[in-house]
């Protein structure tokens, strides 16, 4: 009788142990699977919880996102910062787009880089973003919008009024403000306003953006924002500024109310040897290596020139991988 009881106890203990092992294995498989979803660059936001603020997520973006159609070699040296179109950028992980517009005499907005017309309209960008979000509803697109050049003669309204009456009325735009959470932003375009004269709420509002500086300001009443956007400095000073801002971001990784925006771009010196392409070919992999070595929990919003697959390690991929700490096991 005692042998039967012993056998029964051993059977029960074995069953419990095996169940625990399989449960632990399944949990680890699910966790690994969720982390691996970050490697799907079109859907990398999918495993991140809805409750996480966008300010806390490490997000890659592109600087002067609409410059990819420039054909003239001189204009390319001076003004080209991206070689692939919006959909390529989105499919390769970019979720922040630096859109700079000019109001035309037919009261539409076209994209500019300084005085350079980029042969792209704001409608084209919005339509591309809408299609991407339809295909990938787990994602969000953050559109930084700046008035880049003086209005054409004959424009009937202001830049801000035209945008808000003709474009921002589209329901694709998120109309709430505050410290925006990913769950509210999925499937939406979130506006970051770098233009003045806004009369409509929505997105990140009331931006103070001094030129060629690293600065901290407050938006939406309660969110602090630190921006590193030094673009007319030496190569060494630029790299130091990027790393200093990234270090501050890493050290404040749990501050959900502080957004860090870090531009890796340098302006052109007018030749092939100091063009945005040339600088990006060195800066992008250097900063990617820096992230890789630090293995951080957060690097902020990192805005780069020339998102591509040429310079290993790839900056946008290392930025996205920093989000693995947000995925719950």
Swiss-Prot record:
A GO cellular component annotated for this chain's UniProt record is: extracellular region
Origin superkingdom = Bacteria
**Start and end residues of each PI-PLC X-box domain:** 53-194
State the EC number(s).
4.6.1.13
Q: Give me the reactions it catalyses.
A: a 1,2-diacyl-sn-glycero-3-phospho-(1D-myo-inositol) = 1D-myo-inositol 1,2-cyclic phosphate + a 1,2-diacyl-sn-glycerol
- State the active site: 63 (proton acceptor), 113 (proton donor)
Q: What's this chain's function?
A: Cleaves glycosylphosphatidylinositol (GPI) and phosphatidylinositol (PI) anchors but not PI phosphates.
| PANTHER family assigned to the protein according to its UniProt record, in alphabetical order | PTHR13593, SI:DKEY-266F7.9
Query: What's this protein's name?
Result: 1-phosphatidylinositol phosphodiesterase
| Organism name | Bacillus cereus
Classification from the root reads: Bacteria, Bacillati, Bacillota, Bacilli, Bacillales
């Amino acid at each position: 009788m005692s042998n039967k009881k012993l056998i029964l106890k051993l059977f029960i203990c074995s069953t419990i142990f095996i169940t625990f092992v399989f449960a632990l294995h399944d949990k680890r498989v699910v966790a690994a699977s969720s982390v691996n979803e970050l490697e799907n660059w079109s859907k990398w936001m999918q495993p991140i919880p809805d409750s996480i603020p966008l300010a806390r997520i490490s997000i890659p973006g592109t600087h002067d996102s609409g410059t990819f159609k420039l054909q003239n070699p001189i204009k390319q040296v001076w003004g080209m910062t991206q070689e692939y179109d919006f959909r390529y950028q989105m499919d390769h992980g970019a979720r922040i787009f630096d859109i700079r517009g000019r109001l035309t005499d037919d009261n539409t907005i076209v994209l500019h880089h300084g005085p350079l017309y980029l042969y792209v309209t704001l409608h084209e960008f919005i339509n591309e973003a809408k299609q991407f979000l339809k295909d990938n509803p787990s994602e969000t697109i953050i559109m930084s919008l700046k008035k880049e050049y003086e209005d054409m003669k004959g424009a009937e309204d202001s830049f801000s009024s035209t945008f808000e009456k003709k474009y921002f009325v589209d329901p694709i735009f998120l109309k709430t403000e505050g410290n925006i959470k990913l769950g509210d932003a999925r499937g939406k375009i979130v506006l970051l306003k770098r233009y003045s004269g806004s009369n409509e709420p929505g997105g990140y509002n009331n931006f103070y953006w001094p030129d060629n500086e690293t600065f901290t300001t407050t938006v939406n009443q309660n969110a602090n924002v630190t921006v590193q956007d030094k673009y007319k400095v030496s190569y060494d000073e630029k790299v130091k500024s990027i790393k200093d801002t990234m270090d501050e971001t890493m050290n404040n990784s749990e501050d959900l109310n502080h957004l860090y925006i870090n531009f890796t771009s340098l302006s052109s010196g007018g030749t092939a040897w100091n063009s945005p392409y040339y600088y990006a070919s060195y800066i992008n992999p250097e900063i990617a290596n820096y992230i890789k070595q630090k293995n951080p929990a957060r690097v902020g919003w990192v805005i780069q020139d020339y998102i591509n697959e040429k310079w290993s390690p790839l900056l946008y991929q290392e930025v996205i991988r920093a989000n693995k700490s947000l995925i719950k096991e």
